[in-house]
Every structure is written in C-alpha cells, then in structure tokens.
Amino acid sequence: MAQAENACRLKLLRADVPVDLLPAGCSATDLQPAVNVKEKIEVNGESRLVQKKKTLYPEWEKCWDTAVAEGRILQIVLMFNQTPVVEATMRLEDIISKCKSDAITHIWINTKPNGRILAQTRHLKNAPDDDHPVEDIMTSRSNSGPGIQRRRGAIKHARVHEIRGHQFVATFFRQPHFCSLCSDFMWGLNKQGYQCQLCSAAVHKKCHEKVIMQCPGSAKNTKETMALKERFKVDIPHRFKTYNFKSPTFCDHCGSMLYGLFKQGLRCEVCNVACHHKCERLMSNLCGVNQKQLSEMYHEIKRGTHATASCPPNIANLHLNGETSKNNGSLPNKLKNLFKSHQYSVEEQKETDEYMDNIWGGGDGPVKKFALPHFNLLKVLGKGSFGKVMLVELKGKNEFYAMKCLKKDVILEDDDTECTYIERRVLILASQCPFLCQLFCSFQTNEYLFFVMEYLNGGDLMHHIQQIKKFDEARTRFYACEIVVALQFLHTNNIIYRDLKLDNVLLDCDGHIKLADFGMAKTEMNRENGMASTFCGTPDYISPEIIKGQLYNEAVDFWSFGVLMYEMLVGQSPFHGEGEDELFDSILNERPYFPKTISKEAAKCLSALFDRNPNTRLGMPECPDGPIRQHCFFRGVDWKRFENRQVPPPFKPNIKSNSDASNFDDDFTNEKAALTPVHDKNLLASIDPEAFLNFSYTNPHFSK
C-alpha cells in the first residue's frame, strides 16, 4: 500500500449553533454531521472543487482519518432530518498546521452563516494515500492508538463483604472509631475495620460476620433477614432525644466522635445509646438489646442445627455418649499448639513445620525448608504496588528462580490475604500443566511474603511485541493454542484467571509460553453460586459484564484472550479511550476495527471472542460456533501434540545463559536488587500474627 506523508485524524466533539438557526424542536445535540472531501482540479483552464468520494456520516466523538493533499478541502455540513443547517469549509493543510507535533489538539471550526464546531485533531504520518477511499480508513477510537507502547497495571476495586444487606469494605479511619457491634475501640495503623458503604456502620473485621440486623440503607430483604425476624421478632425502636454530652462520646452507629459543645447528638432515653443526628434514621430497632450476645446466641443455634443435620448417626452418638473423651490424650501436644493463639515469629515456626512434615509426609523425613538467606538477590525483573519480582540464585546450586516479594502491610491494608493464599494454591496446582508457571517454594519474614517460582528467561510477550510491533498469524496461532490449553486447565479446576495480558504470558528458553501472576485468580470456593463479582483486571482487557457490575464466570478469560489475540495480530489494542471512562464506553459499545491484513478466519475468531453475551462467547458451551478448539482459525491443529508440548515453537528467544535477563525491561534490570525495609516498627507490631499461618511450602513436584 502506498503511503502519504501527512494525514489528519479528526473527532467532532460538539457544535455551538445559535438558536435562531435551528429548526423547530431541534437542539444542537440533534444535529448530525456529514463530511465531504473535495479536491481542486483544472477544467478548461479553470480551478474547480470536485467531490470524488462518497459523503461520510461520522458519529459525534468518534475518530476518522483522511489523507492530506495539496488543495484538498474538508466540508462539514450539520443536518437535521437530511436538511442542512450550517456548514464549514476548511483546507486540510490549515487543520494540520494547527496541530502540535504528534499531540492531540482541540480547534474551533467556524460555520456559516453562524456558529462553530469543536473538533479534536491529530497530525498523522505515513498514512494510506489517496488511492483508498476515505470511508475505507474511517475508524473509531478502537483504531486510534499508535501501537502497544506501555505496560498496563491491573486494577482491583475494594472487596465488598455483603452481610445482611450491608456492604462492608476495609477502611482506614483517620480518627478514633468504636465498633458498633461490640463497642470496643478499633486499633491499628492501617485499615482498622470495616465500614458499610450504604449506612456507614463501622465494625471490627472480626465482628462484621456477626452483624444480625438488616442494613437500613439497603433495599434488600433476604431470606436470612426474614428468618431472623420470624425467630427473634427484634423490632424495638429507640426513643431518641437531643442531648448535651459533657464528655467525649462516640456514635454507636458509625463509631466516630460526636463533635460540638452543645447538643452534639441524640441519646436514647431507655438504653442510653448515642448517635449523630444524621445517623438516627440508620439506627437499628434494637433498644435495650445487646447485639453481641444476641449474635453469639443466633450463631450458636445455627451451628447446632447444622451440626445435628450433617453428623452421621454414629458420630452423633459418640458426642452424646462422651466416648470421644477416650481419645483426649492421643492428640500430640505439639499439634494442639497449632490451634492455640500465640505470637507468630518466623523462627518459632521452623520446628512446627518440620513436625508437620513428618506427620503428613508419612514419616519419610522433613521436606527441605527455604528462607531468604538461602538465596542471592541478582536483578529486579518487575515492580508493582505489591512489591517486586527479582531474579535470585539458590546458593551453592547454580539454580536461578524468580522471587515475588509481597509486602505484608500492603496485603493486609488491601484485604488481600485470601487472594495471596489463592495464588499460592494455583501455583502449586501449576505443576500439573506445562503452560503454567510453577512454584518452587514459599516462605515469609516478618515484613514480606515470598513466592519462589521457575525463572522464565525468555521474557514476556509485551517485551517481544514491542520489538517487532506485531506477530504473524502462524506465531499468533501457536501462542493462542498453548494459552487455550492453559485456560481450559484452569477452568476445569474451577479457577478464573482474570488477568490474562501480554505482560503475564512469558516464554521459556525453548519458546513455549507459560502463564504467570495468579494474584487476581478466583476459585469456586470463594464464589457465589459459581459466579464472581469483584471489579478487577487490567482496563484494556476487562470484559463488558465486569464493567456493568454483573456476576461473571470463566467467560471473562475468553474476552481477555480475544484482546490478547487482537494485540498480537494487529499490534495495538482493540478498544481505546483517553481515560478509563472512555475506554470502558468503547468496550461496551464499539465494534473493533479489523484491518485487511488479518485473515477472515482470524477476524471471525476475534468477533466470536468479542461477543458481549458471555453465554454465547467463543470458548463457552453455548457458543453457536461450537467449541473453541474446532473453530476454523485453529483448523489443522493437533491439540494432543500441543497438550504434550510436542509442537516446535516458531520463535526461540535469544538467551545467553541461565541467568540472562536481557529479555526483560532495562528500566527494571538496571535497578539494585534489594528489599525495601519497613522502618515503622509500630506498623509491624499491628500485623495480625495469625494472618499468614502455614504460608511456607516447598513443592515436592517441582520440575525444571
């Protein structure tokens, strides 16, 4: 395709048209633009403007391109019901002259007889020339990017704990707060407790599951709430009156202080409960009721009911007859200590770990335990809000691994303890799939958690695609096949990956791919009815159902897989926006642009993966195109050979040694490999000693 030196990308944002020029019942937002591109030609010695191409009808706030040539004129006509209202004429050369280098520029285009149009323009170079109609290169924002130039971090909204209609989120309280359930002070330097997003009730993390009353700010009326009302009939309203508190007092709902000198809040005449004026309508009808005792009683009854229903008759008889007392002395004292609350330290756990290995390992001797002193820190491979990933060497073995270092305080502050254990579980499970990064061992210090994983020195696909802009179809198909095998393995084990992207697909020394970073993974054990609800992922790869706040399943991974395939084939993202709002709007509403350089089979595969209905998306059972492995894009693929890693890779990364880090970004590898110490000793002291019990693990199935 021939190339032109200059091109102009335009986006019409809005029009300012005087009211007297608008037809009856029409506003400026009702006007529709029509674009004519005219060229100057010589006819019998006279210059005339001739329109050689069809009229374009671009949408507002959608990008479109046109090549710039000498004498070419752009005519924009704003119409209402096919009737012209105002028009503007401008030389394309004048438009690009106002652009600032390669940056996006906003300009006003004057219209006749009056008014103006706000447009966003950008000067492009090496665009298709005039041999191609303007409408052929008309694009939406999905084709407005210059290519993949940056690494994009994942986002995760705060985890919401829904209890009786309350939406509790871990919260950092800048001022002293008391728990509205147990009335105790909420200690801590980070996120000391949970606060409901609807009614602002504040509780300890340990108390949030004990809340028994329905959230007054929620419209929900769950079965549990109805059952609770039927059982306890708790509906005793308070008798509040304005009160002058003579000493510092805290609200029994939101937990914060009642400020002021006079009439700071309300107090119940019967039970002396205090609250802000603004919290009165949110106070539960629990006058004279001890919520903590009532909650304990309710949960005790609930536990007793479940225990009786679930225990087999012989087990129930053992409890009733007291026969279990015969075995009281058979439980080793060391094992009993595991169930006692004690101050945790890394050193004290070593003996317990070895003892547990003997018990569960069949007495064949303890599995070797690893700690930070066993490794030399060599280079930084990557960084994030969680901490770092470093290249390390196992001392005396000449073995190299990738060590992921997670800050304990950051994990606790973001309420991500459960996610850390899920990541550990998936890494252990990865030994059963050749396309997942394996765990070598995990351990901890007082400040950090460590995952030691196999070192994939081929680098990630983001690094390689930045070198050559895009992959050919054969190479893309190879990577896609191995990714499909990996995803289907995870889905078979009821795991949603949720963070598939170029950065997380790494190459080993032979050129085979492996998925890494399972910090966003979700297992069925912590999902509602097999569905997840957390808003998380990398913005460019997030599926429409996540953006809409709907419950979702494994289909989100196939949407991300479609974005990944598009980036490999085209060399840029399928959806674009200047900010997250524009990007998400593009994902929800726009159709990706498929260039002519990709095959029909690839375009058909991408279209099926970009199905906004998750049930019929390619990869899901209800997809009308059938199973993903039988799609025409994968015609001729021997899936058995792929599953066994028997297909030779089309590309082998250049690796000089086992410790070579040349396939990783210099921005990271040039940094000094060191852990950032936590200097705040009070912060370390506030960490729950039992938050990361039994985290240490050595994988007996690890294979290099």
UniProtKB/Swiss-Prot annotation:
One GO MF term attached to the UniProt entry: protein serine/threonine kinase activity
Active-site residues, as the UniProt record annotates them: 499
Residues covered by the Protein kinase domain: 375-634
ZnF segments: Phorbol-ester/DAG-type: 165-215, 237-287
SMART domains, alphabetized: C1, S_TK_X, S_TKc
UniProt-listed GO biological process terms: antibacterial innate immune response; defense response to fungus; intracellular signal transduction; peptidyl-serine phosphorylation; positive regulation of antimicrobial peptide production; positive regulation of axon regeneration; positive regulation of gene expression; positive regulation of MAPK cascade
Catalytically driven reaction(s): L-seryl-[protein] + ATP = O-phospho-L-seryl-[protein] + ADP + H(+); L-threonyl-[protein] + ATP = O-phospho-L-threonyl-[protein] + ADP + H(+)
Keywords for the protein's UniProt record, in alphabetical order: ATP-binding, Kinase, Metal-binding, Nucleotide-binding, Phosphoprotein, Repeat, Serine/threonine-protein kinase, Transferase, Zinc, Zinc-finger
CDD domains linked: C1_nPKC_theta-like_rpt1, C1_nPKC_theta-like_rpt2, STKc_nPKC_theta_like
Stated role: Diacylglycerol (DAG)-dependent serine/threonine-protein kinase that phosphorylates a range of cellular proteins. Phosphorylates mlk-1, a component of the JNK pathway. Involved in axon regeneration after injury probably by activating the JNK pathway. Plays a role in resistance to fungal infection and in wound healing by promoting expression of antimicrobial peptide nlp-29 in the epidermis downstream of gpa-12 and plc-3 and upstream of tir-1-p38-like pathway.
Protein name: Protein kinase C-like 1
Organism: Caenorhabditis elegans
